[in-house]
Amino acid sequence: LVELIRSAAPAAILSAHSFNRYQVNVNGPARAWGEALAGLCHYPVTEDIGYPTPGCLGTYAGRELGIPTITLEIERGLSREAVIALHLPVMREALLFWEKWKGN
């Protein structure tokens, strides 16, 4: 993954993960992007999940490299249908938001 990030040089990174404490976790210059997504899924926006995460994607890409990075921490225990219904619009908005933002 490190080599992919280095070679692809992404302008932003969006990842999804399941966690007991659902949230829109932002790293690097991603706060406005995260707040836009949180408005759709009503998850809190966080910059820290409460414990050290050395080696995680957000720490590496967001904090160390300065790439806007969001980890959408999806609520555990939701059915597949509920995850799709809630998060497909969030993922779509993530892409649309980024397209608008980078155009400014």
Regions found by a protein language model. Name each.
Residues L1-N104:
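Structured catalytic-domain cores with a bias toward divalent-metal coordination
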